[in-house]
UniProtKB/Swiss-Prot annotation:
Main location (coarse class): cytoplasm
E.C. code: 2.1.1.-
GO biological process per UniProt: methylation
Species of the source: Aquifex aeolicus (strain VF5)
Methyltransferase listed as a keyword: yes
InterPro entries reported in the protein's UniProt record: Ribosomal_L11_MeTrfase_PrmA, Ribosomal_PrmA_MeTrfase, SAM-dependent_MTases_sf
Pfam families to which the protein is assigned, alphabetical: PrmA (PF06325)
One cellular component (GO) term of this entry: cytoplasm
Entry-linked HAMAP family: Methyltr_PrmA
Protein name: Ribosomal protein L11 methyltransferase
Length: 245
């Protein structure tokens, strides 16, 4: 635990948003009145006199959790420790909103180690490939059978200033193996291509797109004895982590 100072301010709503936008501030909104916003900052804001200064004891991680992205008009103000992924809206190849995408990101955050090589099967808009690169993967390859998806993957990788090799291909066309493979597909697709995906990873496989326990059970049958390391669940969707060795 650590002691930190919290500066509490009050401003008319319009001035509050102008301040937050112009100075790129991370603040905690404490209360909204009719035309006034009462907010706190964990550092003193130049040019403003705080209504009060509090000394609080708080865990650093919990303190950081209080700072959330703030939307102001067409802008999103993001705390420096967050990793934004910029996505150009496309033709339903993935926006990050679906539970399966979120489960894959959660698994990547836990199991992807810096310096790993990664293959993203069914890359779509490239979100999982981009996240892998941002997490420190040494090399990231994204494949998809749809040329439009491949183009979106390339565009989004450029927007995020990360290197992702995007190709139109099926798993059987890949002639190398990777430390980690991530595949967010559907059970009927896994029934057809999982046999081609499994040889492509050396250490960790992350698989999602599985709905309810019937899909989960069927997927485990397709693994052919490989060890399930962990299962993630959200809103009846599952992601499975498979480990080799």
């Amino acid at each position: 635990m650590m002691k930190i100072k919290r500066f509490v301010y009050s401003l008319p709503e319009e001035e509050f948003y102008e301040l937050v936008y112009s100075q790129n501030l991370s603040v905690e909104v404490l209360e909204r009145k009719e035309i006034e916003v009462i907010f706190a900052s964990y550092k003193e804001i130049e040019g403003l006199t705080p209504e009060k200064v509090e000394e609080v004891k708080e865990d650093w991680e919990n303190w950081k959790e209080k700072f959330k992205p703030i939307e102001v008009e067409d802008f999103v103000i993001i705390p420096s420790w967050k990793k934004p992924v910029i996505v150009k809206p496309g033709l339903a190849f993935g926006t990050g909103l679906h539970p399966t995408t979120q489960l894959c990101i959660k698994a990547l955050k836990k199991y992807l180690k810096e310096g790993m090589t990664v293959l993203d099967v069914g890359t779509g808009s490239g979100i999982l490939a981009i996240v892998s690169a941002l997490l420190g993967a040494k090399r990231v390859v994204g494949i998809d059978i749809d040329e439009k998806a491949v183009n979106e993957c390339r565009e989004n990788a450029e927007l995020n200033k990360v290197k992702v090799e995007c190709f139109r291909a099926e798993p059987k066309d890949v002639n190398e193996s990777f430390d980690l493979v991530v595949a967010n597909l559907e059970i009927h697709i896994f029934e057809r291509v999982l046999k081609d995906i499994l040889p492509k990873f050396k250490k960790i496989g992350i698989f999602s797109g599985l709905y309810k326990e019937k899909d989960l059970k069927r997927f485990e049958e397709l693994l052919g004895g490989l060890k399930v390391k962990e299962v993630f669940e959200k809103e009846n969707w599952y992601a499975v982590v498979v480990e080799k060795g």
